[in-house]
Amino acid sequence: MEAKVMNATEKKELMGKYTKKLENAIKREASVMKEIENDKALIKYLEGQKTSGAAFDNTVYESYDAWIETIRKQIKKSESTLTNIEFKKVELEAIQKYIA
């Protein structure tokens, strides 16, 4: 089976459709930043609770430390998402120049 070779117009049309996907991913940036902010605030709160000796009342996590560690992992994932969004911005800019 022979692969079809796309002409320039077809390539630009395909890339134009891909820009919508990139734009939607980039729109998540503000919500990801807000998640990080909220997670950091929660860590401060939990550390304060732990330091004050407040009773641990949570059935999901074994301890304050386990809960805090889970949140730190979520922050790392969110920071990775922000890095990917920055790459998508560069990619979008390049595609927009290509299809212009």
Regions found by a protein language model. Name each.
Residues E29-I68:
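Extended alpha-helical coiled-coil "stalk/arm" regions
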Residues E2, N24, K40, G53-A54, ...:
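Residue-level detector of intrinsically disordered, flexible termini
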Residues A3-A41:
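Short, charge/polar-rich alpha-helical segments
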Residues A8, G16, N24, K44, ...:
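Generic detector of low-complexity/intrinsically disordered segments
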Residues K20, S52, V60, I71, ...:
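N-terminal compositionally biased, intrinsically disordered segments and leader/signal-like regions
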Residues R28-E29, A66-I99:
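Amphipathic alpha-helical coiled-coil segments
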Residues K4, T19, E37, K50-G53, ...:
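Short, flexible coil/linker elements and helix-boundary hinge sites characteristic
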